Amino acid sequence: MTSQAIQLIDVNKEYNKESLEYFKQCVGTRDVGFNYHVISVFGSQSSGKSTLLNILFNTQFDTMDAQVKRQQTTKGIWLAHTQNVNNHKSTTDTDSDYFILDVEGSDGAERGEDQDFERKAALFAISVSEVLIVNMWEQQIGLYQGNNMGLLKTVFEVNLSLFGKRGNDHKVLLLFVIRDHVGVTPLKSLQESLITELEQIWSELNKPTGCEETTLYDFFDLEFKGLGHKLLQEEQFYDDVKSLGDSFIDSESNEYLLKPNYHHKLPIDGWNMYAEQCWEQIENNRDLDLPTQQILVARFKTEDIANEAYAKFTEEYETETEKRINDKTELVSYLKKIKDECLGEYDEHASRYAKAVYEEKRIELVDKVNERLFTTASKYLDMLTAVLLTKLENGMKEKENIKLPFEDRYLKLFKDIEAEFDAAITEFFSKDLLTKIKDFELKFAADVHEKKLQLRESELNALLSKIKKQLTLRIKDEEIELLSKPTPDLWDKVTDTFENIMKKTLSRFATGEGEYEFKMGLSEDENKKQYHAIRAFAWTLLETVVHDYLKEDTIVSLLRDRFESKFRYDSNDVPRLWKNEDEIDQSFRVAKEHALEILDILTLAVKTDGTEVIPDAFEDEPNEGLIYDDSHDVYHSNRFAHILNETQKEKVQQQFRRQINVTVLDCKRSIVTSSTHIPIWIYAVIVVLGWNEFMIVIRNPLFVTLALLSIVSFYFIQKFGLWGPVMNVVNTALGESRTTIKEKLRQFVLEEHELKKTAKVEEEIELQDLSKNSSSSGNEDSD
């Protein structure tokens, strides 16, 4: 297949912007890859370059009609595409694509001494081609200008400056095609002459620094082909052309010309951009860094391919990922699929460019894709973490686990959720959806640890609340019982009872003397801290109980009770019966001293060994143990031990004395009352004077019956202690009677009031009538 040629660079030195479209038309939908070759021809004007190309590659370049006029035919640089190479083996198209550059001839009359385009065209051809065909006639060999050796020298110098330090094995094949070789001079002799000239030219080059020892063969390979005379040896000419064509298509032949190191390793669309940039820099007389141009082309094309692949990936990612976020298996599978498709598409089209650039852009593309995948993986793992933390929390509260210590429950459940999280993150990592999992593992561990602290704090608070509740009940019950029955060793009992309550309440947590483990996974210091907090609470509670209970009135009551028990009862708890006031006074003094023995004990918490009761749980509190003043401006050194100050104590004593004095006076009055009894003869007088009344009662059956009923009722009421209910019934009856009487009286008063009011109204009406009558009579008299 051969396409119509286009002008790649016109006479005005402008690069054809439609060239890329031309390449697309030539290639179609085929994936050419690197399976294409660029071949250019270089030589003097009217030397038959276009004719040779048309015969060899079946192209359709314009040719000169020598019978009309010898003149310039090819203007600028033309490009043609072909797959049909003239050869001995086959007349069908080859598998490779050939792009042929027909360069304007040198030394033409049309340009005269303007050799600028010749040099630029030659430099362009050698920069973009794999094979540069140098077309010359046999009779030109040995000439300097005629066989373009001067132009080749210029091209060699520029080429050396461009590629002198490139450090790779890229070369350009200089294929010298000797035209009209009639065979008089052997081809080998002509070849040696040309090689000698070329080596001489190379030796005379101005080599840049670092390239002094380079040779012609470091940059170029040389091949020589002779063609018979086209007119005089027509059959030989065409046979030689086919032999030349064989060397372009038979890759198995030793004479195969298109070696891999001649190729620029750019896909066809990349080659077009590369060629355009090369010409732009050549035309603008810039230093032409061809390797850099190849890299720039590779960068542009690979970036374009990467952007296209990423755009497709993004579209699929944004439309479908959210639907699969709750299903790990489906999510991982889908993310893996779209990532592989994205990278596969990039690899397919970008791997043809420079390997370093391709790999660099691939890394950038992978980073962009992984960034999106990282977002999705993070979201899924955050959701999974929330689910697992909820599972951990619920598992900690399950009945079958609640009996286990906190740390045992936590470790058991943590292993399960950790395994589930590790399985999920490993699946993402194994599918290359996550590049790093350490940060996720650390975040998960931190989240779980934070949840553990929350759960532990919650359970610890619940446990402490339960302990404090038990302490509150026990301290209030047992300590108030002791305070209500004070003894000289009261505070020894209070502190001992306090310690016993603490030990009993915390017995299940005790691990040694003064050592406790609350089974919450706390450190030794943390357990000590919790124990001291509980002990501080207990001491605070005890202080509150003591100070709230031992108020002034309560202490007075305790002193009075202690006085009463000693004053009214003997050592056997038998009530005392006093015969005279001396006995009362003696008992009063003893009972008073007995009661006041505990006054100091109740107002100041001091043990029997003389030491004040000082809580041992407030060592770190700045206010405990310091001098402070109370509401009465009395200073104390310890707020727990000092229950009442001296002023309050004196007030208690005064109230106590007043109350016991009243008690003594009542006792003395009872002695006086019992000593002033009724004389016996009075009873004899009552019997004599009331004998008749007694007899009336005894002889009357009704009175006897009522008397018996009254006596029996009194007996049973007294025996069973029913005076309370009886009095309630009596009081209720009296109350009802009283209410009824009041209601009746109220009605009576109201009725009487209404009657009086009615009578008054009637009287007023009568008076009004009388006044009217009298006035009317007066009027009649006046008339």
UniProtKB/Swiss-Prot annotation:
Keywords: Coiled coil, Endoplasmic reticulum, GTP-binding, Hydrolase, Membrane, Nucleotide-binding, Transmembrane, Transmembrane helix. SUPFAM superfamilies: P-loop containing nucleoside triphosphate hydrolases. Residues 449-472 form a coiled coil. Pfam families: RHD3_GTPase, Sey1_3HB. The keyword Coiled coil applies. The chain crosses the membrane at residues 678-698, 702-722. GO terms for biological process: endoplasmic reticulum inheritance; endoplasmic reticulum membrane fusion. GO terms for molecular function: GTP binding; GTPase activity. It is found in: Endoplasmic reticulum membrane. PROSITE patterns: G_GB1_RHD3. Residues 1-677, 723-783 are cytoplasmic. It is an enzyme of class 3 (hydrolase). Residues 33-265 form the GB1/RHD3-type G domain. GO terms for cellular component: cortical endoplasmic reticulum; endoplasmic reticulum membrane. CDD domains: GBP. It is a multi-pass membrane protein. HAMAP family: Sey1. Belongs to the TRAFAC class dynamin-like GTPase superfamily. GB1/RHD3 GTPase family. RHD3 subfamily. Cooperates with the reticulon proteins and tubule-shaping DP1 family proteins to generate and maintain the structure of the tubular endoplasmic reticulum network. Has GTPase activity, which is required for its function in ER organization. This is Protein SEY1. It comes from Candida glabrata (strain ATCC 2001 / BCRC 20586 / JCM 3761 / NBRC 0622 / NRRL Y-65 / CBS 138). The lineage of its organism: Eukaryota, Fungi, Dikarya, Ascomycota, Saccharomycotina. The gene is SEY1.
